[in-house]
């Protein structure tokens, strides 16, 4: 039996390597930018910071990323990394390759430089790290323990204390177990939600300050789910609304003004397997998406949750991340275990296709990023550079990429997400 499994693993590895070679050969035609960087340790989390600096007389801009480490028994860190991204007029040259560093893709005379600027000691791996929108120096992290940690990275030395001691600015209590979901309220400064394997969602207000030492207790604990809560997200336009998704296959919508924390305002059986992630559309107040172990992304309208608006099908395995583009109302991306990051365009739903095109996927599947050879752990849309995405995978690889303009500029469609709201699937 073991030898059969080994044989299957070898075959799969060979297929993955073959696919990667084909992908790499085609990058000049598919991308305007590709930077591949091998991190010292895999990161389970990635998020662009909102700041960008354009050094005078240079053909690149400086961007920053929040990363974490997932080491094998060595000291873990919360990391802020600096990235050089070329200006539009700098020439991208996909043939530039540095196989020693595991890097390729450059532009002009500048290699895509990525360097760790700040490393802060962390207790165990960083399951997820997210900055506070009102003050991006403040970063919350999910740990392998039940605590959620908060760091102001300006108050920590750039190089970590060799003792390995983790010294967060706040320690948020309320959970019994670890988890992944984490969401700051973009309308109420300091209000943080966290999802946990203990079946609950906790809410903290870090402005309330610690009661003793650095400990802040949860302001509310929401107990509606009957299984591991995988993800949680604040609504982007309503300060009191949030959504949560769980292994009980449910999507729940909560209102913090409600008198009860045990029953959501709305709940729906969202998928036929665990629901792993959700994302509210930044432009349309009623639209959200969920991703699931059933290999689909579902589109929802808050005004009628009984009816699923649309199901996006193309992934071959569990979906763990779904994020709307910050720049385009109809653009959504998803990723997960199948090593693929799919970019979807809602405005193309229902378009006619040739039989040949239909074999590649539905009309709304705009792009498949095939550069990863391991499960994708997280990805983030760059808030300053439209169509630039950073994705990280379990094999230490981080990729910063932008699909070729002719792919998304095909013909600009005028359908908005709000026009799709009335159409059920």
Swiss-Prot record:
This is Histone-binding protein RBBP7. Pfam families: CAF1C_H4-bd, WD40. GO terms for biological process: brain development; cellular heat acclimation; chromatin remodeling; DNA replication; negative regulation of cell growth; negative regulation of cell migration; negative regulation of DNA-templated transcription; negative regulation of stem cell population maintenance. GO terms for cellular component: ATPase complex; chromosome, telomeric region; cytosol; ESC/E(Z) complex; nucleoplasm; nucleus; NuRD complex; NURF complex. WD repeats lie at residues 47-122, 128-173, 181-217, 228-269, 275-312, 318-369, 376-403. Belongs to the WD repeat RBAP46/RBAP48/MSI1 family. Core histone-binding subunit that may target chromatin remodeling factors, histone acetyltransferases and histone deacetylases to their histone substrates in a manner that is regulated by nucleosomal DNA. Component of several complexes which regulate chromatin metabolism. There is a cross-link at residues 4, 101, 155, 159 (Glycyl lysine isopeptide (Lys-Gly) (interchain with G-Cter in SUMO2)). Keywords: Acetylation, Chaperone, Chromatin regulator, DNA replication, Isopeptide bond, Nucleus, Phosphoprotein, Repeat, Repressor, Transcription, Transcription regulation, Ubl conjugation, WD repeat. The modification Phosphothreonine is found at residue 10. The modification N6-acetyllysine is found at residues 4, 119, 159. Higher levels in brain, thymus, lung, spleen, kidney, testis, and ovary/uterus; lower levels in heart, liver, and muscle. PANTHER family: WD40 REPEAT FAMILY. The modification Phosphoserine is found at residues 3, 95, 354. Its main location: nucleus. One of its GO terms (molecular function) is RNA binding. Binds directly to helix 1 of the histone fold of histone H4, a region that is not accessible when H4 is in chromatin. Subunit of the type B histone acetyltransferase (HAT) complex, composed of RBBP7 and HAT1. Subunit of the core histone deacetylase (HDAC) complex, which is composed of HDAC1, HDAC2, RBBP4 and RBBP7. The core HDAC complex associates with SIN3A, ARID4B/SAP180, SAP18, SAP30, SAP130, SUDS3/SAP45 and possibly ARID4A/RBP1 and ING1 to form the SIN3 HDAC complex. It is found in: Nucleus. It comes from the Eukaryota. There is a cross-link at residue 4 (Glycyl lysine isopeptide (Lys-Gly) (interchain with G-Cter in ubiquitin)). The modification N-acetylalanine is found at residue 2.
């Amino acid at each position: 039996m073991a030898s059969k499994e080994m044989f299957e693993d070898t075959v799969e590895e060979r297929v993955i390597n073959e696919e990667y070679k084909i992908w790499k050969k085609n990058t000049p035609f598919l991308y305007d930018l590709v930077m591949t960087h091998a991190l010292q340790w895999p990161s389970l989390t990635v998020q662009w910071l909102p700041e960008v600096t354009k050094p005078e007389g240079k053909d690149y801009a400086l961007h920053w990323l929040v990363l974490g480490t997932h080491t094998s028994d060595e000291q873990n860190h919360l990391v802020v990394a600096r990235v050089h991204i070329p200006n539009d007029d700098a020439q991208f040259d996909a043939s530039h390759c540095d196989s020693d560093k595991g890097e390729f893709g450059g532009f002009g005379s500048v290699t895509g430089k990525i360097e760790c600027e700040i490393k802060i000691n962390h207790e165990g791996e960083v399951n997820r790290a997210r900055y506070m929108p009102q003050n991006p120096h403040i970063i919350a992290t999910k740990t392998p323990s039940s605590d959620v940690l908060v760091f102001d990275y300006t108050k920590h030395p750039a190089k970590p204390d060799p003792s390995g001691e983790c010294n967060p600015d706040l320690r948020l209590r309320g959970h019994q177990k670890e988890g992944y979901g984490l969401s700051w309220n973009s309308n109420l400064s300091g209000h943080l939600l966290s999802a946990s394997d203990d079946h609950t969602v906790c809410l903290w207000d870090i402005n309330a300050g610690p009661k003793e030492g650095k400990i802040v207790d949860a302001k509310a604990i929401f107990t509606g789910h009957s299984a591991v809560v995988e993800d949680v997200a604040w609504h982007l336009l309503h300060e009191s609304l949030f959504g949560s998704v769980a292994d009980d296959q449910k999507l729940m919508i909560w209102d913090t003004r409600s008198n009860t924390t045990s029953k959501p305002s709305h709940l729906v059986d969202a998928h036929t397997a665990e629901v792993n992630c959700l994302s509210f559309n930044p432009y349309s107040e009623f639209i959200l998406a969920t991703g699931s172990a059933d290999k689909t992304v579902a589109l929802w309208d808050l005004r009628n949750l009984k009816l699923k608006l649309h199901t996006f099908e193309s992934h071959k395995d569990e979906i763990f991340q779904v994020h709307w583009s910050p720049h385009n109302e109809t653009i959504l991306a998803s990723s997960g275990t199948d090593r693929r990051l799919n970019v979807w365009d809602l405005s193309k739903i229902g378009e006619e296709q040739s039989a040949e095109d239909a074999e590649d996927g539905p009309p709304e599947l705009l792009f498949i990023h095939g550069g990863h050879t391991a499960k994708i752990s997280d990805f983030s849309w760059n808030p300053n550079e439209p169509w630039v995405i950073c994705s990280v995978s379990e094999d230490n690889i981080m990729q910063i990429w932008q699909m070729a303009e002719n792919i998304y500029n095909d013909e600009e469609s005028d359908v908005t997400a709000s026009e799709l709201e009335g159409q059920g699937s």
